[in-house]
């Protein structure tokens, strides 16, 4: 091949050589030149035609090498003309020629003439290269240019500029050689943010990159760097807050020139989240940290160090370190965060201590030094035994800096809890010294002079063998010697003995034959707070081991109340999670269950129901699954344990947070049976109600009409196979649409009331006619016999006023588990009986019998009966009768009302502050004993039956507390049925005080007002009543201003029904301001301080958000009005809203409005429509500047040139950034149905792109279907605008954005729909967008499309970017 090529080209070159040798003598005319070219090409064409496809590239490379081997510019020029003609006549493929020329090793800038001629040729033929080829050439040319040094002779610059001209041609927008988006991507790869382009390119490249700033802006959320989440709020777990763990930058899509602040590390965001209590899961989520992979994260380390420095600064200004003060809460939280992140090796302890030393050096901050040492002591004492001494020595360096005293530091007052902090440094020294001794290290660290008195005091205290509990000496000794077993036994032994009891004394517990060890006073919280994590771990380990030992021994003596209460308190500490709650759920519970220690099991479930706070949802769902397993075991089929298991399960189900339901239940999709009850219809109904509420509050089903393809489907189908049931139409109408559709399709035939009555009569006849006692007992308690026995007991009481002993025996034989079915039928039977009763005397008789069955005979507990009644699916009149029975049961006799009022009056919900709970608990049970084994009936029958059932220990529960989750359900049922509103008000008046003991009163109110928004719209009085009853029940246990605003309490609570209070703008501004100040960490904050460990909410912002939403939903104003008023806080000029942090206000509005029901936030769509229809976007003369300035909120705001469109844009972004994917899924419909018909101008189109562009990434990750619909809508709008305009001025930014959308998000998923639209556009647009469609008639030349190489911005194959299956 080479020989043939040589003969063809050398023939032509020969004549050139002669001409060069005798210049002037031989001169070719242009015609001769042409002839030579044609003959050379003719010979080459023949040769090329015989070549195989595989040899083409090799052939062209040889020709280039041959040309570059020539030294005469004229010869090179002639040969290049040959190549150009070969390309122009279609003989050679232009892409291959250009690539071979530029990739040639001999093309060097020093050969300036060759360089200039080569790039001239490339410039001539590059127009025929396909767009991907042009992209690859651009990359190679840019890299070639980089080989030119910074200084060259000015004589050669002109020649070198030929390369720049090729680049200029490639970047020329009107030439459209490739999507400009490809070009900017290649440029930004070589010249990222902050790197200057090569001098040869000058401003050519930077100007071109600048043309992409509008595209970058279209893809950016306005003020994104100022937006902050509420930790533990539903939105906080979504992708919006993710950061790069190495740089802390936002993960931005595409290599666009985004605004500078988006490229900065987002330290403020991470720092804000870290400052929030209970934020560690969110931090891991944001940074993609996984506990299983121990990876150090230096940026996180830096922020933790900065937080400690901030706490040191705060301590410097605080007068005193008071109990529950801001500074104490901050140090407490810091210690918890530090232990977690260092324990899982996301942060390195020695690095952090050295960094702290560096940042505190020379600052003179020493007021907080004891607290800092306390935080470090927590980690040191817990991990020094497992790590090298060298890791902890930097602490001594910190000591030298912070403790400059030359004299002794005096011993603090050990009656105060702060004394443990003052001793922290001495404790650290003791641990370091102990480690050095154990390691036989040469490094003996002498006791620092200033700490000598502290050390002597500890040594002396250790010699005192009888330690008292009245000061903090025991805590000090535990903290100092927790790594020294000889010394540690004494103080830890003293603690343990206090709560275990001395082994001899016994005290009674509620119920018959139930005794416990005699210690009743738990360890107080401030003592537990004063123990290091290491000491607390030893204590909790000791307790858990003792409980397991007692479980194995099947001890008949119950655990001491002090031990149970202390154990509950220890479980609040997140720092000891592995031995705490994790051990409780994964080890202790299963072990106790295996040992059949039912008393201890009952105790653990009671602890979980009444004493635990902030337990992570996966532990709660794990417990629920344990409970369903438990319920199926024969041994748990006894009244008290069965009741406890069901009550605990009910609490777990109803207390699930709306944003927790989906993530938790999707973990069980492969086997939904584990989290569902195989036999309890009530528990499964409770789960469906929770599902309905959760999907409503998170807007999960918004925009969908079926549960097909969603995670709910398997759960619902499994429930229907376990416990088939129906829902009353008034309950069903509140369900989200897809759930309604499911239950309408899966309708279950109900037994008619008439049949039920007939069956009862039939069984009653049998009862009366049978005479053999054993036959009667067998018949009525047999498995599979109809569950009508309670109906029979009712009939007996109605007719004979008593029940005989056989009745009692049958009940006993039926067993707790089977009896539930009898209660269910009885509930239906009661409704039938009451519906047909004649009223008057007969009705009173019915009520009396019913109450006797509960209170006199103890046949069924009130909470179970009410739960069954509330969960039946009666319609119309019968539903009203059912609720009438509930009301009678709760209010008619005094039994329950007295129990409630006494319990509320004598007890406080703040159990962590009490040391006498047990005494009050026992007094209450003496006055109102719980009877769970039909005792009343046993006493009444003739002859009376002696009951032998020993009670399982009851430490916390009673009928009032058990009734609370049932009351939650009752209120909801009453809300659904309009005619029973008055009865609900009466119930709230008499029993509302119980909400004082609800563990989530505000959340319950929030969920209720949110879920029933439609039902409560026109019932302002009832809403107010509900809020007043629940919030009012807490008035004695909460400081003023903890929840509702003063204005609301003054104006709304006292407003009359006919004249409701309508708030003004000032009210809304103050309400939003309250959340803004809370999130900014203002001190003192808008809400009183509290111990977040025992609060309903995990941090101040979550509390502020929920109470604000409750207050807004409780207003007697429509959702639309409230929504508009909230938007007006920033869209209207408000004197109360400071200009300088307007984005913080937008952030707060975004958080609040997205946490409210749809009517509140949907008003934003109306605002967007009015902006899009406003003259500044519809008329070309209204705004003559650059539209991107008009939409730039930051620039408009800073230059005081406020425009309503930029404000609305920024606010819409804040709202949508906080929205759930369900809320966002209304955007496609909004685009196609509302905006598409009105978008006619270029400004309007660009505004819509600005609005929705930044959210394509979330749609791609979370709901692909919506992303595809939006993609198509964007093209439809473009077609509209193109048809309505004579000329588009901003065609390039529009096309750049559409290319970005294709390569970053939609891929080819919208190709079919889009091709049709592009074919109808005007030529200039069609030319620019032709690469999106791949339609051959739009391609520049019939060039075979080449395979795309790896430098591409995104795949171009026929697939959607597959980050999510197209599920919805």
Swiss-Prot record:
Coiled coil: none annotated. Residues 1347-1368 have a biased composition (Polar residues). Keywords: Activator, Disease variant, Intellectual disability, Nucleus, Transcription, Transcription regulation. GO terms for cellular component: core mediator complex; mediator complex; nucleoplasm; nucleus; transcription regulator complex. It is found in: Nucleus. One of its GO terms (biological process) is positive regulation of gene expression. Belongs to the Mediator complex subunit 23 family. This is Mediator of RNA polymerase II transcription subunit 23.
